[in-house]
């Protein structure tokens, strides 16, 4: 590479001397324009004056053979020097890569450009609190030094406070305002819906539940005993039995007592289309009132459902009865003994 730089210095000096002697610029000599112009002049001298010798024509123009040789050979020399520089630089880069490769041949993962390129698959994991983990409190100290200049702590403190205030005005206040507006809108909607449910007139509609009431009545009227038992009692007593009644055979002497229905108390039924009467708060305080069946709904809209209301609405929690191990083992023992007795009886009957 040093020899190439030396040749470049000699070439630049020769081209500069030729440019000073002929009046052409270095760019024209390097591009070959000066050599083309001189050849045109030599051709014109050979045509007009009949000079056929190149040396005589060069002398007639006022150039020396050395200067003409430099001007004519400068473009080719520059092109060859460029190729030489490219070759030398390519060899040097290959040598550098080979040196790095063979010096780090034991590494299985290439680390070339790992720390310069952010899009690599492998990167060093350095979280923001990395140095604060190693040295607790260093981030706070660095931030204070960065934000407050000890030499000009007054202006820097004012600038820091103004920036923090501007950050709050620009970013925090709009978000807080939108959240508060959302809360107030939701609260207003719930309050309006609750007051609408309180002030509206409610009407009883039994049509959707008549079908379920009929099914409930049907299953409640079914006999709690098997029809075969009823037939046996009827055959014994000589009485005809109609199914679809509620029977009770506890301490029964005849089929009439078995087929006797239970007397149900007549309850006042509420008919469809009747309006629910509104009640006014006593004492003249004009407090808000609501029926008891609507209270869980209204409190749920306001988000104040108490455990007592949850138990009233969902019913008490029924816990499973635990069975002791002793009783279960006794039950298993009795079942096993019953099975063995049955087996013995069957064997004796076969024999």
Curated annotation (Swiss-Prot):
<keyword id="KW-1161">Viral attachment to host cell</keyword>
<dbReference type="GO" id="GO:0019062">
    <property type="term" value="P:virion attachment to host cell"/>
</dbReference>
<keyword id="KW-1163">Viral penetration into host nucleus</keyword>
<keyword id="KW-0813">Transport</keyword>
<keyword id="KW-0406">Ion transport</keyword>
<feature type="short sequence motif" description="Nuclear localization signal">
    <location>
        <begin position="315"/>
        <end position="323"/>
    </location>
</feature>
<keyword id="KW-0946">Virion</keyword>
<keyword id="KW-1162">Viral penetration into host cytoplasm</keyword>
<dbReference type="GO" id="GO:0034220">
    <property type="term" value="P:monoatomic ion transmembrane transport"/>
</dbReference>
<feature type="region of interest" description="D1">
    <location>
        <begin position="272"/>
        <end position="307"/>
    </location>
</feature>
<keyword id="KW-0407">Ion channel</keyword>
<protein>
    <recommendedName>
        <fullName>Minor capsid protein VP2</fullName>
    </recommendedName>
</protein>
<dbReference type="GO" id="GO:0019028">
    <property type="term" value="C:viral capsid"/>
</dbReference>
<dbReference type="InterPro" id="IPR001070">
    <property type="entry name" value="Polyoma_coat_VP2"/>
</dbReference>
<keyword id="KW-1160">Virus entry into host cell</keyword>
<keyword id="KW-1182">Viral ion channel</keyword>
<keyword id="KW-0945">Host-virus interaction</keyword>
<dbReference type="GO" id="GO:0044167">
    <property type="term" value="C:host cell endoplasmic reticulum membrane"/>
</dbReference>
<keyword id="KW-1038">Host endoplasmic reticulum</keyword>
<dbReference type="GO" id="GO:0016020">
    <property type="term" value="C:membrane"/>
</dbReference>
<dbReference type="GO" id="GO:0003677">
    <property type="term" value="F:DNA binding"/>
</dbReference>
<feature type="region of interest" description="Disordered">
    <location>
        <begin position="312"/>
        <end position="351"/>
    </location>
</feature>
<dbReference type="GO" id="GO:0075732">
    <property type="term" value="P:viral penetration into host nucleus"/>
</dbReference>
<keyword id="KW-0238">DNA-binding</keyword>
<feature type="compositionally biased region" description="Basic residues">
    <location>
        <begin position="341"/>
        <end position="351"/>
    </location>
</feature>
<keyword id="KW-1133">Transmembrane helix</keyword>
<dbReference type="GO" id="GO:0140267">
    <property type="term" value="P:symbiont entry into host cell via permeabilization of host membrane"/>
</dbReference>
<dbReference type="GO" id="GO:0005198">
    <property type="term" value="F:structural molecule activity"/>
</dbReference>
<dbReference type="Pfam" id="PF00761">
    <property type="entry name" value="Polyoma_coat2"/>
</dbReference>
<keyword id="KW-1048">Host nucleus</keyword>
<keyword id="KW-0426">Late protein</keyword>
<keyword id="KW-0167">Capsid protein</keyword>
<keyword id="KW-0812">Transmembrane</keyword>
<feature type="region of interest" description="DNA-binding">
    <location>
        <begin position="312"/>
        <end position="351"/>
    </location>
</feature>
<keyword id="KW-0519">Myristate</keyword>
<feature type="transmembrane region" description="Helical">
    <location>
        <begin position="289"/>
        <end position="309"/>
    </location>
</feature>
<keyword id="KW-0472">Membrane</keyword>
<comment type="similarity">
    <text>Belongs to the polyomaviruses capsid protein VP2 family.</text>
</comment>
<dbReference type="GO" id="GO:0043657">
    <property type="term" value="C:host cell"/>
</dbReference>
<keyword id="KW-1043">Host membrane</keyword>
<dbReference type="GO" id="GO:0042025">
    <property type="term" value="C:host cell nucleus"/>
</dbReference>
<keyword id="KW-1188">Viral release from host cell</keyword>
């Amino acid at each position: 590479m040093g020899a190439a730089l030396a040749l470049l210095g000699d070439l630049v000096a020769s081209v500069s001397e030729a440019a000073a002697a002929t009046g052409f610029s270095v760019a024209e000599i390097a591009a070959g324009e000066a050599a083309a112009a001189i050849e045109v002049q030599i051709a014109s001298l050979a045509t007009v004056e009949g000079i056929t010798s190149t040396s005589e024509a060069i002398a007639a123009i006022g150039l020396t053979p050395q200067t003409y040789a430099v001007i004519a050979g400068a473009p080719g020399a520059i092109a060859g020097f460029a190729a030489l520089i490219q070759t030398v630089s390519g060899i040097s880069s290959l040598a550098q890569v080979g040196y790095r490769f063979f010096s780090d041949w034991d590494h299985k993962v290439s680390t070339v450009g790992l720390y310069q390129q952010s899009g690599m698959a492998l990167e060093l994991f350095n979280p923001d609190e990395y140095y604060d983990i190693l040295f607790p409190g260093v981030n706070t100290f660095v931030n204070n030094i960065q934000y407050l200049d000890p030499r000009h702590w007054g202006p820097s403190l004012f600038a820091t406070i103004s920036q923090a205030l501007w950050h709050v005005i620009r970013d925090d206040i709009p978000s807080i305002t939108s959240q508060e507006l959302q809360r107030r809108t939701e609260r207003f909607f719930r309050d309006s819906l609750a007051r609408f449910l309180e002030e509206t007139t409610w009407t009883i509609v039994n049509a959707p539940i008549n079908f379920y009431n009929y099914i409930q009545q049907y299953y409640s009227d079914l006999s709690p005993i098997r029809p075969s038992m009823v037939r046996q009692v009827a055959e014994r007593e000589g009485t005809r039995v109609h199914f679809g009644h509620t029977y009770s055979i506890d301490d029964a002497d005849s089929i009439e007592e078995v087929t006797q229905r239970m007397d149900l108390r007549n309850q006042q039924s509420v008919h469809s289309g009747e309006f629910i009467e509104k009640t006014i708060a006593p004492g003249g305080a004009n407090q808000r009132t609501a029926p008891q069946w609507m209270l869980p709904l209204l409190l749920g809209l306001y988000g104040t459902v108490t455990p007592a209301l949850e138990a009233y609405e969902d019913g008490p929690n029924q816990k499973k009865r635990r069975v002791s191990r002793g009783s279960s083992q006794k039950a298993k023992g009795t079942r096993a003994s019953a099975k063995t007795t049955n087996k013995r009886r069957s064997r004796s009957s076969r024999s």
